[in-house]
Every structure is written in structure tokens, then in C-alpha cells.
Swiss-Prot record:
PROSITE patterns: FBOX. SUPFAM superfamilies: F-box domain, Galactose oxidase, central domain. It holds the Pfam family FBA_1. Residues 2-56 form the F-box domain. This is Putative F-box protein At1g67450. InterPro entries: F-box-assoc_dom_typ1 (IPR006527), F-box-assoc_interact_dom (IPR017451), F-box-like_dom_sf (IPR036047), F-box_dom (IPR001810), Gal_Oxase/kelch_b-propeller (IPR011043), SCF_F-box_component (IPR050796). It comes from Arabidopsis thaliana (Mouse-ear cress).
Length: 398
């Protein structure tokens, strides 16, 4: 008697699903209805989570979101001359002109640079999307942050130097905060979400007078920016390079690239709260004599290595590259050409079961087509109106 997939005992099914790579999630869900249901009730496909880097970024020429994957074992294998970088476009958003990509708690926030005043929140693991209407038609001129409060209610912070608003997923509404964020942040420094709160690198205006740089955090429970937290290094010049990352969104990781001393340091928090922080050195790499603007990175604590993404600033080689740095000084260069926008280099991704739909899930592509159709009708109406107007004027004066 042949046993069907749907007849397998639960413990065996869970064991199978735990060993499948996350890149095979689609195949798992199409196997049978039972497996599809299980994959949406719990996180499966953990088989090679510790062996691969999975992230999302955006293409430079097409402004569309794509997923990317790096095999960490392959990176460490010196016998492998060419490390495979798996990049796939997300067809679901092929119609969107993306401007920025933000990440928190398994959710991606996609910001367009179009005038329909909408942003998109997407849970790649559950396949859910949510369109959010912004109050400002120039929403693409803001910066954003994702987070959640003590009740696990997710929110979006939308801010610039003059205005600060917050969106509540539960109430599906925006409100203006009575604070003005005096953020002197470098556009290439990505903020990072840790335990629901967002941390920003804050650079002071005058080196040597007060704090040259610190961590400014936004508390999504209190809906306030809170006091600056000290960094584990001293910034000596404005062009010293700082970047942020995280470990499973539980520990903040900060990278300091001191060009003058040709030294790169990476530190990990042993404690992180809105009002307190402590640090431990992860690795220090000396004699790093390459002019390199770090914009994104991730670390593997077990393998004791870091993969640092960024852009070479040398006149001979202006391209997007990654350096693999190990505890023993191991260094390997991965050249990605011009695939990525420097400020949108990969964000590390971990799946989550956060449900973001409210009522019927909206189709991003259908909404995009609807907006284009509406714009086309408006332009057509204006064009016809102009023709009628000029025809009338001509008939009067002839």
C-alpha cells in the first residue's frame, strides 16, 4: 500500500519541512494542501538557514525589488574560484518603480517614487501585501522605519527634518507626532530594527565638541526619539565610515571603517535597550588600505566571518563589491558590478508569521494598473479639453 504525502504523521512532516531550504518554499507549498497550511502556521524551511545569506535589494537600472542568496560555505572555500550569487526579480512588484527598501521583523517596506502616494508592506514568507495610503503626495522625500510596540502592534515611522508621522497597522491610520527629528544622518547609513525599536547612527555637527557620533533610538511604544547611546569607538573625521546591521534582530552590530588608520572594526551589542547599551568586539581587520564605502553588511557568529557590501571609491574601480573578512584576517573580494544601488545594498532577511492584511488582500499590480489607467484618463481629458478650447479660440478670431 502506497502512502500519500498527506498521510504522513505530523512529527515526520515537521522533520522533513525543517530540513528543506527556504528557497524551496514554493515547491513545499505546492506539494499538498496540508503542507501549504503547515508552512503558514509555523516557520519551516530552516535546513540551510545557517549556511546561506538571504536578503533583498533593488536593481540599479530597473528599480525593482529582487531577492539574493549567498552560500556561506562556498564563500569560505578557497578552491571555489567563482562564488555564485543567486539573484531573482520579484515578479509581484515588477510594475513598481521602487525608491527605497526597508526591513523589520520579517516585513519589507517598499517605497515608490511615484505620485500615487502609496507605500507597500510585504511579508515574503506568507506572501501577503498591504498597500498603505500616505497623507503627503511627496512621500518619497521622507525616510521610513518599521517597528512594533510592547503589544507587538506594528507601526511605520515616516520622517524628515521638518515633519514626523506614524502609521498604526491596527487602526489603519496616520497621525502627526509633535516632535521634529533633528537627524544629521548620512543617507548611506541604514537604520536598524532591534526588538521592535529602531536605531539610527547620529553624527554630530562638530567633531571634538561633544559627541562626534552616537546611536539615536526611536521607541515605538512611547512614539518618541530617546537619548543617544554611546558607540564603542571614537569618530575622528567626518569621512569615517559607519554602518549598522543586526543578528536575528536581537543584537545590534556596528561597523567602523577608519580610512586614515586603514582599520575596520565590527562590534556586537551584549545588551541593547532604548536607554542602555553595552558592546563586545567581534573582529578587527587591520591594513585595510582600500577606499571603500560600506553601506551594508552581515556577520556569521559561528563561522566568525563578515560579508561587507559597499562601493569602491578608487578612480580605477568604481563598482559594487563585497569583502569577506574572517577572524584570521582572511579576505576575499566578490565583484557584483553595477547590479545594486549603493544605498540599497542587501538587507538580511529572516522569515516571520506577522500577518499584515486587513480585510481582502490588495493586488499591487492591479492597483498599479488602476493608477495608470486613471492617470491616462486624466491626461486624455485634459488633451481633449485643450483641443476644444483652442478650436473655439481659433473660430472666434478667424
Amino acid at each position: 500500500m502506497t502512502m500519500m504525502m498527506s498521510d504522513l504523521p505530523n512529527d515526520l512532516v515537521e522533520e522533513i519541512l525543517s530540513r528543506v531550504p527556504i528557497t524551496s518554499l514554493g515547491a513545499v507549498r505546492s506539494t499538498c494542501k496540508r503542507w501549504n497550511g503547515l508552512s503558514k502556521d509555523r516557520i519551516v524551511c530552516k535546513g540551510d538557514a545557517n549556511q546561506q545569506f538571504t536578503g533583498f535589494t533593488r536593481y540599479v537600472n530597473e528599480s525593482t525589488v529582487c531577492s539574493m542568496r549567498l552560500d556561506l560555505n562556498e564563500i569560505q572555500n578557497e578552491d571555489v574560484e567563482l562564488v555564485e550569487l543567486s539573484i531573482n526579480k520579484i515578479n509581484k512588484f515588477i510594475e513598481l518603480e521602487l525608491f527605497q527598501v526597508y526591513y523589520s521583523d520579517g516585513l519589507l517596506l517598499l517605497v515608490t517614487d511615484e505620485v500615487d502616494s502609496k507605500i507597500v508592506v510585504w511579508n515574503p514568507y506568507l506572501g501577503q501585501t498591504r498597500l498603505i495610503q500616505c497623507r503627503d503626495t511627496e512621500h518619497f522625500k521622507y525616510r521610513y522605519a518599521l517597528g512594533y510596540d510592547n503589544n507587538r502592534n506594528h507601526k511605520i515611522l515616516m520622517y524628515n527634518r521638518k515633519n514626523c508621522e506614524i502609521y498604526d497597522f491596527k487602526s489603519d491610520s496616520w497621525k502627526v507626532l509633535d516632535i521634529i527629528p533633528d537627524l544629521h544622518t548620512n543617507i548611506y547609513v541604514r537604520d536598524m530594527s532591534i526588538k521592535g525599536n529602531t536605531y539610527f547612527f547620529y553624527r554630530g555637527e562638530k567633531i571634538g565638541e561633544g559627541l562626534a557620533g552616537c546611536l539615536l533610538s526611536f521607541d515605538f511604544t512611547r512614539e518618541r526619539f530617546v537619548s543617544c547611546l554611546p558607540l564603542p569607538f571614537q569618530i575622528a573625521k567626518f569621512d569615517d565610515n559607519v554602518a549598522l546591521s543586526s543578528v536575528r534582530e536581537e543584537h545590534l552590530v556596528v561597523l567602523f571603517n577608519n580610512w586614515e588608520e586603514s582599520e575596520m572594526e565590527i562590534w556586537v551589542t551584549t545588551k541593547i535597550e532604548p536607554n542602555a547599551v553595552s558592546w563586545s568586539n567581534f573582529l578587527t581587520f587591520t591594513h585595510f588600505r582600500i577606499k571603500f564605502l560600506v553601506t551594508s553588511f552581515f556577520i556569521d557568529q559561528e563561522k566568525k566571518l563578515a560579508v561587507v557590501f559597499g562601493r569602491s571609491l578608487s578612480k580605477q574601480m568604481r563598482c559594487n563589491i563585497a569583502y569577506v573578512i574572517g577572524d584570521n584576517g582572511y579576505l576575499r573580494i566578490l565583484d557584483f558590478g553595477v547590479t545594486f544601488i549603493p544605498s540599497n545594498l542587501p538587507v538580511s532577511y529572516a522569515p516571520s508569521l506577522v500577518k499584515i492584511t486587513q480585510g481582502q488582500e490588495l493586488s499591487v499590480i492591479e492597483e498599479k494598473k488602476r493608477s495608470r489607467l486613471l492617470a491616462s484618463l486624466v491626461y486624455s481629458t485634459l488633451f481633449v479639453s485643450f483641443i476644444i478650447f483652442f478650436s473655439f479660440i481659433s473660430s472666434v478670431f478667424i
